[in-house]
A protein has these predicted regions:
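Primarily the internal scaffold of c-type cytochrome electron-transfer domains
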Residues: 18-39, 46, 54-122, 126-133, ...
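Helix-start (N-cap) detector for alpha-helical repeat units in TPR-like alpha-solenoids
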Residues: 441-442, 475-476, 509-510, 543-544
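Register position in tetratricopeptide repeats
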Residues: 453, 487-488, 521-522, 551-555
Length: 561
């Protein structure tokens, strides 16, 4: 659910001072070797390698095995200036530690550095990096893009005029690059225990489940021997994005274990009839489901039909390797008659195209088009559609039908992302779902959000209060309720709500700006300044925050944003 702020930000970007984080717990954890710490039955890759040495050695050459690790293990030193923001970035190592420095010439407020703790991404397409600010984990504003061998801004920030230094490292994204993910602190999105994960990369147990019982002589999950649905979900947990993903009450996607049912943790929704909205970096499962190969092969075809999860062919062997996978179904006689001078099936039928959500990156088209030069018409963004699209669960024939709660929250998510035409649909579904689950804080918060957007403050207040009575750590609900209280001249209640929300999410600039403004209007200028300094600790290039701090420091302070 989104935040409805009193202060409108011109952009969602930021800046920072040099933080003394080199000796922080997260920094120390990042410098250690891979941690094969047994937890909940996990034993680590080393235990697997003792009996499966050849498979382990082969797997170590794959991208998944190196999907994350200490930043110093995968650092390409460089420097560049981002034209739109004017910020100069330098990526370098110093005394065995990785650093990102930044400065805008002529602007002393935008100057500092952050220690890069972990890399995220195997490097086949690119890498992002993680750093810490006061115990909260964030993604670097700059990424390494392998295809073009360049450093550039993180996705969606190519044209940003401010430096985005508060991009939270969400568990929902992070868990697909690491193993034995540790849950963030209650009420937070990006404050993790030390260390945030116990194993670098995608470990053996991410696909086979905890191995303690197997090491002791018992069984372990072999995805190939699971039912087709459970088998496919082992891959789907990280290679399916969908239009909306809804986590189940009290559950998180990173808690899924192979052999279990993924829908017990998260349920996916896609737009009916869409051919995927561009080729996203993690849309492979959805794209494959649209292919005629998959439709006609049914459960016989899955990811491992073409991919060996324990092996990656060398670049010079890939054409022959994947051609053999195609011919296993299509037959050599067919292939001889079909473009005998072109042995590379993939380049024609699964061409690499520019990713729709990651700059400088190409992704393979898993739709396996018969005539790739004739592209199916892509469905435009739903927020631009004259009529409402249909949102359907994925997979459509899953073992469990989507319950009313999931569909209602999925529609609310679309509204939050900009599809205002779906507000009535979302409200209707939310009301029906809340009749069956009257004490679900997610539903209550979502209803409050819709009512607040419609200007029905009293109804929204009631929903938010009920949600917060059940879970007082709902940041969005607290912040949105604070807006209602502030507009109702109930400053004390508004401040208390914003204080709690900002404590849990200090990287959320809009919350800090609202809190500082309310302090200022109450005559508490010192408190307002302290909040602005806290905002700038996380977002030092945020123009709205810098401007408010300057106005607060005047002889006659001004409270306007």
């Amino acid at each position: 659910m989104g935040v409805l702020s009193l202060v409108v930000l011109a952009s969602s970007n930021l800046r920072a001072q040099d933080a003394a984080i080199g000796n922080s717990p997260l920094s120390q954890a990042a410098s250690r070797a891979v941690m094969n710490v047994a937890a909940s039955g996990y034993v680590g890759n080393a235990a697997c390698a003792r009996c499966h040495a050849s498979i382990y050695e082969s797997y170590e050459s794959t991208a998944m095995a190196h999907a994350s690790g200490p930043a110093m293990d995968a650092l390409t030193p460089a420097e560049f200036t981002h034209k739109e923001s004017g910020v100069h970035y330098r990526i370098y190592s110093e005394n065995g530690r990785a650093w990102l420095s930044f400065e805008r010439p002529g602007d002393p407020e935008v100057r500092g550095r952050r220690e890069l703790l972990y890399y995220i991404g195997s490097g086949r397409r690119g890498r992002s990096y993680l750093f810490e600010t006061d115990g909260f984990l964030f993604e670097s504003p700059v990424n390494w893009y392998t295809d073009k061998q360049v450093w550039d801004m993180a996705p969606a920030y190519q044209t940003s005029r401010e430096m985005p230094l508060n991009l939270p490292a969400y568990a929902s994204c992070l868990h697909c690059h690491v193993s034995e993910m540790q849950p963030p602190a209650k009420g937070t999105d990006d404050r993790y225990p030390n260390p945030p994960f116990l194993h670098n990369g995608v470990s053996c147990e991410r696909c086979h489940g905890p191995g303690a019982e197997h090491v002791a002589g018992g069984k372990i999950v072999n995805p190939e021997k699971l039912s087709p649905g459970r088998r496919d979900e082992v891959c789907m947990q990280c290679h399916m994005e969908g239009k909306v993903a809804i986590e189940q009450p009290g559950r998180h996607a990173y808690e899924f274990r192979p052999g279990g049912e993924l829908s017990d943790y998260v349920r996916y929704f896609v737009l009916a009839g869409s051919q995927t909205q561009g080729l996203g970096a993690v849309s492979q499962v959805e794209a494959l489901a649209q292919s005629q190969c998959k439709k006609k092969s049914g459960d016989r075809m899955w990811c491992a039909t073409c991919h060996d999860p324990h092996f990656s062919p060398a670049a010079e062997d890939r054409v022959a390797y994947y051609r053999a996978r195609c011919l296993a179904c299509h037959g050599s006689a067919f292939a001889v008659k079909h473009h005998p001078d072109q042995p590379d099936c993939v380049s024609c039928h699964m061409p690499a195209s520019q990713s729709s959500d990651v700059a400088h990156t190409e992704v393979t088209d898993h739709r396996i088009l018969r005539r790739p030069q004739v592209e199916p018409q892509l469905l435009q963004d739903p927020s631009q559609e004259a009529s409402l699209p249909k949102l359907v669960p994925f997979p459509a024939n899953g073992n469990r039908e989507s319950n009313p709660r999931d569909l209602a929250l999925a529609w609310e998510s679309l509204v939050e992302s900009g599809m205002s035409a779906g507000e009535s649909q979302a409200q209707s579904l939310l009301e029906k779902a809340s009749e069956k689950s009257p004490n679900d804080p997610a539903l209550l918060s979502a209803l409050g959000y819709i009512e607040q957007k419609h200007g029905k403050a009293e109804r929204a207040r009631s929903f938010y209060q009920r949600a917060l009575a059940i879970d007082p750590d709902l940041v969005d609900a607290a912040s949105n309720l604070a807006v209602i209280e502030a507009k109702s001249a109930n400053s004390r209640a508004a401040v208390a709500l914003w204080q709690r929300a900002f404590q849990l999410a200090p990287g959320r600039s809009e919350i800090g700006l609202d809190l500082a403004r309310e302090y200022c209007l109450s005559g508490k200028i010192d408190e307002a300044r302290d909040v602005m300094l806290r905002v700038l600790e996380f977002n030092p290039d945020l123009g709205a925050a810098k401007g408010m701090l300057r106005r607060l420091n005047r002889a006659s302070p001004s409270c306007e944003p």
